[in-house]
Amino acid sequence: MSVVGIDLGFQSCYVAVARAGGIETIANEYSDRCTPACISFGPKNRSIGAAAKSQVISNAKNTVQGFKRFHGRAFSDPFVEAEKSNLAYDIVQLPTGLTGIKVKYMEEERNFTTEQVTAMLLSKLKETAESVLKKPVVDCVVSVPCFYTDAERRSVMDATQIAGLNCLRLMNETTAVALAYGIYKQDLPALEEKPRNVVFVDMGHSSYQVSVCAFNRGKLKVLATAFDTTLGGRKFDEVLVNHFCEEFGKKYKLDIKSKIRALLRLSQECEKLKKLMSANASDLPLSIECFMNDVDVSGTMNRGKFLEMCDDLLARVEPPLRSVLEQAKLRKEDIYAVEIVGGATRIPAVKEKISKFFGKELSTTLNADEAVTRGCALQCAILSPAFKVREFSITDVVPYSISLRWNSPAEEGSSDCEVFTKNHSAPFSKVLTFYRKEPFTLEAYYSSPQDLPYPDPAIAQFLVQKVTPQSDGSSSKVKVKVRVNVHGIFSVSSASLVEVLKFEENEEPMETDQNAKEEEKMQVDQEEPHAEEQQQQTPAENKAESEEMETSQAASKDKKMDQPPQAKKAKVKTSTVDLPIENQLLWQIDREMLNLYIENEGKMIMQDKLKKERNDAKNAVEEYVYEMRDKLSGEYEKFVSEDDRNSFTLKLEDTENWLYEDGEDQPKQVYVDKLAELKNLGQPIKMRFQESEERPKLFEELGKQIQQYMKVISSFKNKEDQYDHLDAADMLKVEKSTNEAMEWMNNKLNLQNKQSLTVDPVVKAKEIEAKIKELMSVCGPIISKPKPKVEPPKEEQKNAEQNGPVDGQGDSPGPQAAEQGTDTAVPSDSDKKLPEMDID
């Protein structure tokens, strides 16, 4: 089973796998561990990753990048509206209202959903992993920003399904970093000791995330998270782009923003300049040849001036740091270390701001680029039964408070309740109790829209169906289980109706006197049982933490509810009936459409494969033309007649011209047939050359074998001691085989020496190899027969002398022993061992 972690970044992606030796980040076909999050659409196929990145300028309108933040967002979303101006490609409103990406693919206009585009990238990463692992990749853990909402998370989950992946967990990026940090630490405090608090700062290309985590041995608990969803490396790039657009506009009278290709070129150069300034404080040049209208442009920038222009961005670094400490109720002195990851944390001013806030040196023990994917791979290994991993419990948090709202006819309106507070432990389940006579709807939403980086606070609506009153007409007790799962997605996972079957001793039904009051109320399980359980959990139990949280929470609630005071105990028999739930999720893709996307992705993968095979076949023809043309005037020259060489050379030239004219775009089979046609002419020449290279070596080896056996025959005839044990009849066989081999070799050598090199050889290398094997199989076993061993003479008296006294020493045997003689001697070894042989 494969164990894969995927860091799905805004600008670039990484894939890591768990192997016997640990976690390894995989390199792609370009030997680069970083794969650009980029897809380019062409008339025949798609290019994904590094191949697509090279087409960003040449195929700007059909090359898609920066699409990660469109997940689960409507076309009318303010964020999408703001992003439009930064995109070289077109985005459109889909029939569902979501954001679509418009490109020209296979010579026709196509609209793709964000899920489809992300699935294309995931398919490429999957292919990269499979090429290294040499086996199928299905199970994986994928990273998402910690600030993603339900709709965005479900959108990414749909993308993994379209790509044919089974996502075991959507893991928050900061949590993945914390896992990569903590699982290898050997000096963490014990479970009963005060935890070690570590802050993780992740500033990538598009966003800025901070989390504070508490570590104990074998345990990681996220305490709080904070973020700035738009502060990242690209904001610093934009500062440079805007500066040079203004400067070049004045200096060269160019309107750069009117030409998307010019703007893309400038953006690429500014990103390079930004990275250079991180390591160099002096003035650095920026030069672009033939930038616009055949005009060469140039400018300079230094770190000091750049930081002045970025003052407003740098001011946004501190608030999330302060927020995360306030949420976790920690002081700066409580922080053990501050670990930084992400490409933008390499900017010296950013590091300085973070270090100054905490008043301590920053820690850089993790790989800034690969920490997230390594954490995801570790989580996948923990979840996989195929790997034995050190026990490590992971408790994440709910980033936003979640509430439920339901209709309350008795109160002529609606009621609501906050079921998960901000920074509540996750994964987690709660059981809510309602009293209802008919089906009802629960509406889930985020309680604090002002904290949400998303325009719509709604999560979903859940219709609990088939709710009926009790047989006496009273309200039924309905237990509803709500859950935030390992992906951070909220759901009403189950609902059940408690049906009263029988009342004994003519007593009133339990809770009947309260039914009128509780008609439209609900009960929420308290969270204390979970907290107690967390303290009592052993590391072994922590591995199944999410399930234990849910089970114990529900069980403890039932225990409380079902154990009223003994004096008022009502003897009732009840049964539980599961109720169907109809989900109406925000921006959810329906199953039928998802299957269609899966089918389309399969077709596109096949089209890419066919295109690659066609290109490989075409390249093989071109490669063969160049190879044979060079060798015909080189090492193959004396193995082909002049007429044949001239005609073959002409054929090669015709093929080369055909490749760039009529044969430029042909089906794969045409190239395969063309290559076979050329090889029919070239293969005999190649064979003659190879035979001429191998034949002398093999004849030499055969001659050595014959010479060796002739020496043995001569030694045997001279009756040398070394071979005097060999049988004369066998040696006659050796002599006969050796003479025959010598005669065969001399005959073939004479014939071959008379043969021209431009025709096929008289004898081939494989025939000589067969003759060598034949000779060795006959002669080898005979001459290598070992001499028989000569047994040394036995010393018969030795044992007898050692059995009795030596030189008169030792006790004499008694009279009885003397009379018995050897019949009463000490039992022999075989006699001693005999009883043991009877024991099973």
Curated annotation (Swiss-Prot):
Subcellular location: Cytoplasm
Record carries keyword Ribosomal protein: no
One Pfam family this sequence matches: HSP70
Gene Ontology terms: cellular component: cytosol; nucleus
Superkingdom of origin: Eukaryota
CDD domains xref list: ASKHA_NBD_HSP70_HSPA4
Keyword terms of this UniProt record: Acetylation, ATP-binding, Cytoplasm, Methylation, Nucleotide-binding, Phosphoprotein, Stress response
Assembly and interaction partners: Interacts with TJP1/ZO-1.
Protein name (record): Heat shock 70 kDa protein 4
Organism of derivation: Canis lupus familiaris
